[in-house]
Amino acid sequence: MVNNRSSESTTTAVSSNGSPPKACAGCGGKIGDRFLLYSMDRYWHTRCLKCSCCQAQLGEIGTSCYTKSGMILCRNDYIRLFGNSGACNACGQSIPASEMVMRAQGSVYHLKCFTCATCRNRLVPGDRFHYVNGTIFCEHDRPTGLLNGHLNPLQSNPLQGSPMLPDQKVC
């Protein structure tokens, strides 16, 4: 099955008996094999439908394959790149493949849902924020324990040239 967040189709093995050869979406060659795959409204040699990351032949795996950002992915690589689900960590709603997202510690958010837990202001790329136990805080509303050093800090990716607290992140 192919999951494209906004639409689904199945990967189907089709017999090519008696029909003119189809062009493979992977290699462009004619498919003269007895069986071919039909996925994402295109035909594929069984050897050509591959994960864009690990090159696993998806016709052989017999499980789901996913497409996002122009890539065809096996389940493991989809989860590695885009998180466990295509759902927003804040609202639980699905996130369309074409939509921009915000990420924090492996969690994925709609842009509109990436807000401070205290003041509810939306954080935008470039804003500094604190991510404490799965909760987002803006710079102004960070928990007072962070100021006093009482909360365990999370690791962060420091912004070049700017000093940051251990739990501080940059969108």
Curated annotation (Swiss-Prot):
Upregulating conditions: By irx1 in the neural plate. By bmp4-signaling in the ventral mesoderm. Down-regulated in the dorsal mesoderm at stage 11 by Spemann Organizer repressors including gsc.
SMART domains reported for this sequence: LIM
Disordered as annotated region, ranges: 1-21
Stretches with biased composition (Polar residues): 1-19
LIM zinc-binding domain segment(s): 22-84, 86-148
Domain of life: Eukaryota
Entry keyword set: Developmental protein, Differentiation, Gastrulation, LIM domain, Metal-binding, Neurogenesis, Repeat, Transcription, Transcription regulation, Zinc
A Pfam family this chain is assigned to: LIM
InterPro entries recorded: LMO_RBTN_TF, Znf_LIM
Tissue specificity note: At the start of gastrulation (stage 10), expressed in the mesodermal marginal zone. Shortly after (stage 11), expression is down-regulated in the dorsal most region. During neurulation, expressed in the neural plate and ventral epidermis. At late neurula stages, also expressed more rostrally, and then in the brain, migrating neural crests and ventral epidermis.
GO biological process, any: mesoderm development
GO MF, one annotated term: transcription coregulator activity
Described purpose of this protein according to its UniProt entry: Acts as a positive cofactor of GATA transcription factors to establish the identity of the ventral mesoderm during gastrulation. Down-regulation in the dorsal mesoderm is necessary for the proper formation of this territory since, when present, lmo4 may bind ldb1 and restrict the availability of this cofactor for Spemman organizer transcription factors. At neurula stages, suppresses primary neuron differentiation and modulates gene expression at the Isthmic Organizer of the midbrain-hindbrain boundary.
Protein's name in the database: LIM domain transcription factor LMO4-A
Organism, scientific name: Xenopus laevis (African clawed frog)
Gene: lmo4-a
